[in-house]
Amino acid sequence: MKTKSTCAQNPNCSIMIFRPTKEEFNDFDKYIAYMESQGAHRAGLAKVIPPKEWRARQSYDNISNILIATPLQQVVSGQAGVFTQYHKKKKGMTVGEYRELANSKKYQTPPHLDFEDLERKYWKNRLYESPIYGADVSGSLFDGKTQQWNVGHLGTIQDLLEQECGIVIEGVNTPYLYFGMWKTTFAWHTEDMDLYSINYLHFGQPKTWYAVPPEHGRRLERLARELFPGSSQGCQAFLRHKVALISPTVLKENGIPFGRITQEAGEFMVTFPYGYHAGFNHGFNCAEAINFATPRWIDYGKVASQCSCGEARVSFSMDAFVRILQPERYELWKRGQDQAVVDHTETMVSTSQELTTRRVTKAPRKTWGLKRLRLRQVSRSLLPIATVSNVPCNMQVCHTSRQPSDVKGDDVQKSDSARASPHPLSLPSSGHMSTRRCSLGRRPCELGAQESSNGAPVKRQLPAGRDDTSPSPELQPQAVSGDLIVDSGLVNPGPQHLMTASEGGLTSDP
C-alpha cells in the first residue's frame, strides 16, 4: 500500500543528475521512485547517466539506409527572444543523406568555445538558416537483448493502455527516433496527457534542455498567453501545438523560474508530469523517446489540459487506470465526483522499503528491429491495419490531431502517406524501428518524447496486437556551478549512488 508524503527534498527545484549502479539500474520503476524521493520531479526534468557497463546498442554502423520519410524544415518568425516555429515538409531522405546535410557548410555547428557560447549563438541566430529535423521516426535502436532501460520495454503502468484498451499510440506507448542537426528545436510543451517521458541520446552532438518546475507551470502558461495572444485566443492549450519558443532571457525578465542542462551521448533525460520543457540540438545526433507512467501520474492524467482547436489533441480515457490502480475511487470517478487535486511537491512512497509498484502482467510485445525499419529501397506497399474494436474497457480512442514536433523534448506533423508502415526488410541487426509517431487527435508540432507545416507532427493510434515497437544508499548531492550544466563524468562520483543537484541550474529574478 502506498502513502503520500510531502517531499521536502530539492526545495530549489534544481535539475538533478543521477548515476545508478549496475544493480540499481535493473529496476526502472523503483529507480524512478527513488529519484522522486530525492525531489527530482520538482524540477520537471532530471538526467540519468547509465552504469559504464551498460550499452543500448553494440554498433550504429548499419543505420545509414533508414528512411526519414518526412523531414521537417523548422522556420521561425518573431523577435526579441519570442518566436513562433512552424514546419515545412521536405522530401524523404536516408539517415546517411541527412548526416551529410547536417554536416554541410550550410547547416553545420558553428565554432564555439563551450556550451554556453553555443547557446548564445543559438538564440542570436535562430531566425536564420532554417534547420531540418528528422523527427518522429517510429521505432527503436535499442538492441533486443538490452533489458535495462530499453525504452520500448519499460514495463510501467502505461502498458494498461494497450493491455486493457487495445490502444497503441506511436510516440506515446511505442518509441520515436529523432535525427537532429544544429539548431533543430523542440518548443515549450508538456507531454501528452501530462505523462512522464524518457529520452536517450544514442549518439552524436549534445542536446540542451530548458525546464520549468511543475509548480511554476501556470506562470509559464500565463506568460505565453501574453506573448502569443492570437494563438491563446484560438486554443485553450495552444502550447500543446509545440510552436512557441521563449528564450531564457525573456523567462528571467518575467520572473519565471527555470533550469537548463545539456545532455550528451549515452545519457538519459526524464521529464516528469506537467513539466514544461524545450531545447535544441548542437549538431547531428540521434535520440529516442517514449512516454511512460507511474501511479503518481494518474491524478495528473485526470486533469490534463487538452488542445481545444483540434491541432494537437492526443487524449484517452483514464477509466482503466482508475479502475485498476485506484479502485477505492472508481465509483466516485464514474459519477464525476472524484476531484483530483495535484500537489507538485508531493511524491508517492511505499510503506515498505521495496517501493513496490503494482505490476501489470504483460505478454512481451514484438518489436521492430532494423529489419522492420523503413529503408530507401523498401517497397512502399502497406501492411493491413486492423480496426480497434471490442476493446475491454471504456477508454476512448485517442483523438489524433497534432502539430509537427519541435522536440520530446521532439515532435512533427505527418502526411497521410507517411502514416502507413512498409513491409519489413531483412537486415542482420537488432533493435526496432519504423517511421512515424501516431497519436489520436494530434498533429505534428514538436521534436523532442515530439514536427509538418504550421505545427508539430501528429501521433497516430495503432490497433493493439500490431507488430510494432514497441533501498538505495544515501546520496551526497554535488553542486555543479553555472547555469548551463555540463557533467564531464571524469570526476570520481564518490558514492556509488551519486546524484548531482545543479546549483544555479534554476534561474529566476529575485
Swiss-Prot record:
Binding site for 2-oxoglutarate: Y133, N199, K207, K242
Biased segments, Polar residues type: 470-479
Keywords attached to this entry: ADP-ribosylation, Chromatin regulator, Dioxygenase, Iron, Metal-binding, Nucleus, Oxidoreductase, Transcription, Transcription regulation, Ubl conjugation, Zinc
Domain of life: Eukaryota
Sequence positions that bind Zn(2+): C235, H241, C307, C309
GO cellular component: nucleus; pericentric heterochromatin; site of double-strand break
The protein's name in its UniProt record: Lysine-specific demethylase 4D
